[in-house]
């Protein structure tokens, strides 16, 4: 209907161009309504188009439901996201993402530890959001360890490039290149070259510790084996620089016994 009205007005306007000089005095009377009508049509188109995108975005956001993957203590899991990205989740880790992940954005939220093999897509950067920091990548392989409440954030880059930001803004803290490691321990940041990828072998069920404080090892063992470890002698927690490599199937008793040979202590296991 609008188009027919527009064509009718257009025809009247064209006819007026061939009118006499006397009629030309009346042109403004014909032209002004024409301009107002054209403006209405243009406004209607703009409003209609804007309304379409607003409705589309509304439906997109409304239909997006959070998807949550939680891995219990003592277990690991591997998933593949809609864009083909593969994710390995360590014990006591949770990954959350929208049900429409990959359509207009690629955002995931991590509480715990995960290894990512991100499918490359320059138009849709991949973001990992954690309690303290967020990581931005296009397509790469990297590890993130950031358990809520620990005040610790670690990222190891295996391949590609990643940018690291605070969780609250978009000001880049640092950019990691291949084989680089970044950590934020309660506001104290450090960046180093990773000597090896051994400690990333948790994906295979191999736990590798290289110059790790005893307290840090105990914390990981609690997650890996779903146990609660109580230390009666605080002096033990001051032990630093412990190095070792253990298979998951060795069990926590074997690991503690092996460590106690280098740093003597006694332990007991109470079955619940």
PLM ranges: what are they?
Residues 19-41, 45-272:
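A residue-level detector for the "anchor" residue at the start of short, highly conserved motifs
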Residues 1-25:
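A short, acidic loop/turn at secondary-structure junctions
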């Amino acid at each position: 209907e609008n188009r027919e009205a527009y064509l009718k007005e257009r025809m009247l306007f064209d006819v007026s161009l061939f009118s006499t000089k006397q009629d030309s005095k009346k042109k403004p009377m014909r032209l002004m309504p024409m301009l107002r009508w054209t403006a209405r049509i243009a406004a209607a188109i703009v409003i209609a188009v804007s309304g379409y995108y607003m409705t589309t975005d509304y439906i997109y956001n409304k239909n997006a439901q959070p998807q949550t993957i939680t891995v219990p203590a003592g277990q690991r899991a591997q998933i593949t996201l809609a864009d083909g990205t593969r994710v390995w989740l360590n014990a006591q880790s949770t990954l959350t993402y929208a049900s429409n992940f990959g359509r207009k954005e690629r955002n995931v939220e991590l509480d715990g530890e995960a290894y990512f093999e991100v499918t490359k897509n320059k138009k849709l950067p991949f973001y990992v959001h954690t309690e303290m920091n967020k990581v931005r990548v296009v397509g790469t392989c990297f590890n993130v360890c950031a358990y809520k409440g620990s005040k610790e954030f670690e990222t190891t880059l295996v391949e590609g490039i990643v940018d690291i930001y605070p969780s609250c803004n978009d000001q880049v803290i640092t950019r990691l290149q291949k084989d680089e490691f970044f950590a934020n321990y309660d506001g104290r940041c450090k960046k180093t070259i990773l000597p090896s990828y051994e400690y990333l072998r948790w994906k295979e069920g191999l736990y590798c510790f290289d110059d790790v404080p005893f307290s840090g090892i105990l914390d990981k063992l609690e997650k890996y084996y779903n146990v609660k470890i109580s230390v009666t002698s605080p002096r033990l927690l001051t032990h630093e620089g412990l190095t070792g490599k253990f298979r998951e199937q060795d069990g926590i008793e074997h690991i503690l016994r092996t460590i106690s040979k280098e740093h003597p202590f006694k332990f007991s296991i109470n079955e619940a």
